[in-house]
């Protein structure tokens, strides 16, 4: 069960004196950029929430779509951090930063494997994706193709790529290995939608934490 992501309604956009929307913490052009980034996050949240019901029926297009949306949230948040006066947020700390880092690394691995570099994912060794596996398709279940030779079954989670039973996962990546068996057999890699959505959830929580920090701690007179 995937819960809907929190929207941005509780971040006050109607005031230039509150939180993220304090104008003085940006250069003039950067304030407008921040507004665009916030809009990007807001639209991505809406699309992710509206797609949840559609995930009940398998469609590989939805998988690629939600990965792209979470990536937009991740990049937009990092872009917001990049345009805020660095002195103002030098003491900002997110209590779930280690958890976010773990999810972010997982997300970058699955994004590369499924969307960005399916035939050449080499930079995520900690997730078993060091160039050995080639992702050739996204499927609901290998049972639809009983004639396909299947050798190994894996799960790809926050703990990395592990060889184990992958029943009851949300979707499956069909992979080959040119090193293990010269691409003779499919590998079945199970993945969960919730792991992808959780990454977005943590970035949204960090955005709220940043807004709260700026509301309470960023005073213009301290930086004049």
What are these regions (language model features)?
Residues 1-36, 43, 94-224:
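Acidic, Ser/Thr/Gly/Pro-rich intrinsically disordered interaction regions
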Residues 23-87:
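Short, contiguous, well-structured surface segments enriched in hydrophobic/aromatic residues
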Residues 83-91, 221-223:
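Short acidic alpha-helical/loop segments enriched in Asp/Glu that coordinate divalent cations
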């Amino acid at each position: 069960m995937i819960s809907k992501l929190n929207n941005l309604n509780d971040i006050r956009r109607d005031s230039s004196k509150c939180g993220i929307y304090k104008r003085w913490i940006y250069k003039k052009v950067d304030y407008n950029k921040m507004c665009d980034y916030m809009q990007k996050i807001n639209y991505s949240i809406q699309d992710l929430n509206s797609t949840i019901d559609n995930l009940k029926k398998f469609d590989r297009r939805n998988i690629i779509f939600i990965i792209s949306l979470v990536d937009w949230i991740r990049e937009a948040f990092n872009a917001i951090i990049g345009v805020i006066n660095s002195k103002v947020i030098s003491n900002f700390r997110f209590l779930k930063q280690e958890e976010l880092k773990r999810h972010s690394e997982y997300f970058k691995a699955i994004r590369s494997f499924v969307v960005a570099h399916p035939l050449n994912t080499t930079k995520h060794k900690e997730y078993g994706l060091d160039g050995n596996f080639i992702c050739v398709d996204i499927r609901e279940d290998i049972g639809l193709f009983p004639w396909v030779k299947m050798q190994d079954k894996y799960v790809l989670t926050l703990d990395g790529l592990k060889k184990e039973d992958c029943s009851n996962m949300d979707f499956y990546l069909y992979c080959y290995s040119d090193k293990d068996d010269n691409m003779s057999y499919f590998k079945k890699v199970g993945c969960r939608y919730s792991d992808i959505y959780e990454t977005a959830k943590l970035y949204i929580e960090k955005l709220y934490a940043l807004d709260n920090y700026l509301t309470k701690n960023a005073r213009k007179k301290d930086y004049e």
